[in-house]
């Protein structure tokens, strides 16, 4: 039985990857950080009590900032595959906490690679590094492919660039099977609420049911290549099953604006909207309502505004990946469209919003946490 070690297992990608590997018959080990509150909601459904007979899923406390912990865990587990998905992954937060972002995202990758090397597992353990399309930043060509020069535009992207190149360096220096997946934006109902797609679908659901008045966004002209996390974790696994390690772009090859994702999300909730104004004065107004979900929304309501607080210090205007290498060499193609992904996300957030609305209607004090 193959053994896999996943950092970031409590996140969106980690939870989907754990499901995928368990279905493949793997023994899955995940590293989770100690928290004062429960942070395992995405993996509760696959959790196995260690007292059960022959469990295949194990959680370990650890942190990418703790060298000795990583060395010990790699020694104890002796993994066949490591998927380094753990990171401080929010671009805006990286401007507020640049040192922490560098420590986790850059040095954390080095610590994990060193844990493999120090334990003498260079030729046993295969290593996958979750890289990012943010490396391209101020894009040098469209679309972006494996050979496109990097131009990072945030502390997060700079940290991830170090992680990318140290992974390449360990592959070339020590003969490790180590590779980078350059992941373009990928979403799902498990996406964190502060990331723009989930922020949008959650707010639209809340607005439809009268739990929120208005959604505030930054640059709505931003173009992104959005795929589904399920498709992307499948590609991550495929990358470690090849004869030779290579780096791959993981993307759909299609892009839409943030504005269009808002429109798409609203339509899934039965709300038609019209945009007007420009720049910080742009708004979206409800023009029609066509679904029973939107019980509290009214035609004429302004439900989207621009807030300059959400502009990045250095903006990344467009990201569009070219996944042709993945298709040609691995046979990978994304199976879930952005429209299907959006519908799934809105449906999930509507279900949650309906529960909150029901509690509120029956006299319970329900507060909806909104991004500041």
UniProtKB/Swiss-Prot annotation:
Origin superkingdom: Bacteria
Alphabetic keyword roster: Lipopolysaccharide biosynthesis, Lyase, NADP
Record flagged with keyword Lyase: yes
Pathway in which this enzyme or protein is active: Bacterial outer membrane biogenesis; LPS O-antigen biosynthesis; Nucleotide-sugar biosynthesis; GDP-L-fucose biosynthesis via de novo pathway; GDP-L-fucose from GDP-alpha-D-mannose: step 1/2
Source organism: Yersinia enterocolitica serotype O:8 / biotype 1B (strain NCTC 13174 / 8081)
Name by which UniProt lists this protein: GDP-mannose 4,6-dehydratase
Active-site residues, as the UniProt record annotates them: 132, 134, 156
Cofactor(s) it depends on: NADP(+)
One protein family per Pfam: GDP_Man_Dehyd
Protein residues bound to NADP(+): 8-13, 63-64, 85-89, 100, 160, 186, 191
Gene3D superfamilies hit by this protein: NAD(P)-binding Rossmann-like Domain, UDP-galactose 4-epimerase, domain 1
Purpose of the protein: Catalyzes the conversion of GDP-D-mannose to GDP-4-dehydro-6-deoxy-D-mannose.
Protein family: Belongs to the NAD(P)-dependent epimerase/dehydratase family. GDP-mannose 4,6-dehydratase subfamily.
Keyword Repeat: no
UniProt-listed InterPro entries: GDP_Man_deHydtase, NAD(P)-bd_dom, NAD(P)-bd_dom_sf
Reactions catalysed: GDP-alpha-D-mannose = GDP-4-dehydro-alpha-D-rhamnose + H2O
UniProt-listed NCBIfam families: gmd
Coiled coil: none
Protein EC: 4.2.1.47
Entry GO MF terms: GDP-mannose 4,6-dehydratase activity; NADP+ binding
Cystine pairings recorded for this chain: none
Biological process per Gene Ontology, one example term: 'de novo' GDP-L-fucose biosynthetic process
């Amino acid at each position: 039985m193959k053994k896999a070690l996943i950092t970031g297992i409590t996140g969106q990608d980690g939870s989907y990857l754990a499901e995928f590997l368990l279905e493949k018959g793997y023994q899955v080990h995940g590293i989770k950080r100690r928290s004062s509150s429960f942070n395992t909601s995405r993996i509760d459904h696959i959790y196995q009590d260690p007292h059960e007979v022959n469990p295949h899923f194990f959680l370990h406390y650890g942190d990418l900032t703790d060298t000795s912990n990583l060395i010990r865990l790699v020694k104890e587990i002796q993994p066949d595959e490591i998927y380094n998905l753990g990171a401080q992954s929010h671009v805006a937060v990286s401007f507020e906490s640049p040192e922490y972002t560098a420590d986790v995202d850059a040095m954390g990758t080095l610590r994990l690679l060193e844990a493999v090397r120090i334990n003498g597992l260079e030729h046993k353990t295969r290593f996958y590094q979750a890289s990012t399309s943010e490396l391209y930043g101020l894009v040098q060509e469209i679309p972006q492919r494996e050979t496109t020069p990097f131009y990072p535009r945030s502390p997060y992207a700079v940290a991830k660039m170090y992680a990318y190149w140290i992974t390449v360096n360990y592959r070339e220096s020590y003969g490790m099977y180590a590779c980078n997946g350059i992941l373009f934006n990928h979403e799902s109902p498990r996406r964190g609420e502060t990331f723009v797609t989930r922020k949008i679908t959650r707010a639209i659901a809340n607005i439809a049911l009268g739990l929120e008045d208005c959604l505030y966004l930054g640059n709505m002209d931003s173009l992104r290549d959005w795929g589904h996390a399920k498709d992307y974790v499948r590609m991550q696994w495929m990358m470690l099953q090849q004869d030779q390690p290579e780096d791959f772009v993981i993307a759909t090859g299609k892009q839409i604006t943030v504005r269009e994702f808002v429109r798409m999300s609203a339509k899934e909730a039965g709300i038609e909207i019209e945009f007007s104004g420009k720049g910080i004065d742009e708004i979206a107004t409800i023009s029609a309502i066509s679904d029973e979900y939107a019980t509290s929304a009214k035609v004429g309501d302004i439900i989207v505004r621009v807030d300059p607080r959400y502009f990045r210090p250095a903006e990344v205007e467009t990201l569009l990946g070219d996944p042709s290498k993945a298709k040609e060499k691995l046979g990978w193609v994304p199976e879930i469209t952005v429209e299907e992904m959006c519908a799934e996300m809105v449906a999930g957030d509507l279900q949650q919003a309906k529960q909150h609305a029901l509690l509120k209607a029956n006299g319970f004090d329900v507060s909806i946490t909104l991004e500041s």
